[in-house]
Amino acid sequence: MKNLVEELKWRGLFHDMMPGTEEQLTKESTTAYIGFDPTADSLHIGSMVQIILLVHLKNFGHKPIALIGGATGMIGDPSGKSDERNLLDEATLNKNVAGIKAVLSSFLDFNTTNANAPILVNNYDWMKDFSFIDFARDIGKRITVNYMMSKDSVKKRLGAEGEGMSFTEFTYQLIQGYDFQYLYKNHNCLLQMGGSDQWGNITTGTELVRRMGGEGAKAYALTTPLITKADGSKFGKSEGGNVWLTADKTSVYKFYQFWLNTSDDDAEKYIKIFTFLDKNTIDGLIEEHKTAPHLRVLQRKLTEEITILVHGKEELEKAIKASNILFGNSTSNDLKGLDAATFLEIFDGVPQAEISKTDIEAGINIVEVLNEKSGFLKSNGEARRALSANSIAVNKEKVTEEFTLTTKDMINNQFVLLQSGKKNYFVLNVK
């Protein structure tokens, strides 16, 4: 087998592993899993590392299992959390499970039948019929409270000021541990992977497998590092909050812009983590970028690869066109091809004014539009001078002083874009 661990190390995707893990992965095709708790109806780019890890696993000939925590999601993982999580109601949880299934299915084909075909499971399916007494006898008996108390996630919560930790969250590591035992027994799963903050929960699982699996039972663990920005700040958030993997929560345009605005240092790091480009290709891109940083070769390639991976090539092309409207050459047709939501995102922060649809239906001379109707320019004189200098455009098309604004100039029957010079924009919102 090709060495998966070596691949993860040069990509910056490796943090730690249990002894014997690398040997197991190079010896034979191995089944491994990663869990995703349904705390929302989508996943954000922070979860991309784990999804990418599952894809690498499959590409190296191993069998990936994606586990959705329908049961653990009812409890809430205390790892890295300072406060108790609010419990989700069943309807919300079911909606979230369906949403995460859809996201994972866009990266891994769970319908293939080859030997290392990915599997999608939900731990609610094997936990729902477990009575409390049965769980306490069969699972709780195998792990001591001392062992559970030694975990960092527990220590931090019990040592911090506040409410401490409920019994519900305290049992989380036991339920996650049993997931590993169940998958070991039913799918011959030998490895659990996850973020470095999951080490405590994962090793509870390896311990449970060894204690319940009998003589010779093997279980391994591998974790990825916490991804941060070059300045040490948390990765995965923009000014508007989380960057999600579904367009209903983060538009493709905003997703595209997030990656395009990556710093040079971060781009060099992220292109190894978030793309499947090989080492020679990436090394070549890094060298090319160093010779001409202003061309942003790394950022553009990173953005292109990850936007195609998450949203597809067609959506990438739309995002590029949308970006060119504000930052490059574009036409009136490009502008009119935008939906209303993308139009507003592109021109977010651009000055706006409302204008009466009745006025536009009657037709308004451009001088009046630029001054009295919008306040875009300070006076009729300034408007006429700008028009004489050929520096005024309506919807990306240059106009003269004789131009009359009418309903045919509306974008999405709602907007008109005014422009003075190269960079001064103004949006008319037709009401």
Swiss-Prot record:
CC per GO annotation: cytosol
Residues annotated as binding L-tyrosine: 33, 172, 176
Gene Ontology molecular function: any one: ATP binding
Keyword Cell inner membrane: no
Keywords: Aminoacyl-tRNA synthetase, ATP-binding, Cytoplasm, Ligase, Nucleotide-binding, Protein biosynthesis, RNA-binding
Location relative to the cell: Cytoplasm
Entry's EC annotation: 6.1.1.1
Chief place where the protein resides: cytoplasm
InterPro entries xrefs: aa-tRNA-synth_Ic (IPR002305), Rossmann-like_a/b/a_fold (IPR014729), S4_RNA-bd_sf (IPR036986), SYY-like_C (IPR054608), Tyr-tRNA-ligase (IPR002307), Tyr-tRNA-ligase_bac-type (IPR024088), Tyr-tRNA-ligase_bac_1 (IPR024107)
Catalyses which reaction(s): tRNA(Tyr) + L-tyrosine + ATP = L-tyrosyl-tRNA(Tyr) + AMP + diphosphate + H(+)
Residue ranges of every copy of the S4 RNA-binding domain listed in the record: 364-431
Quaternary structure, from the entry: Homodimer.
Family, similarity comment: Belongs to the class-I aminoacyl-tRNA synthetase family. TyrS type 1 subfamily.
Protein name: Tyrosine--tRNA ligase
Source organism per UniProt: Flavobacterium psychrophilum (strain ATCC 49511 / DSM 21280 / CIP 103535 / JIP02/86)
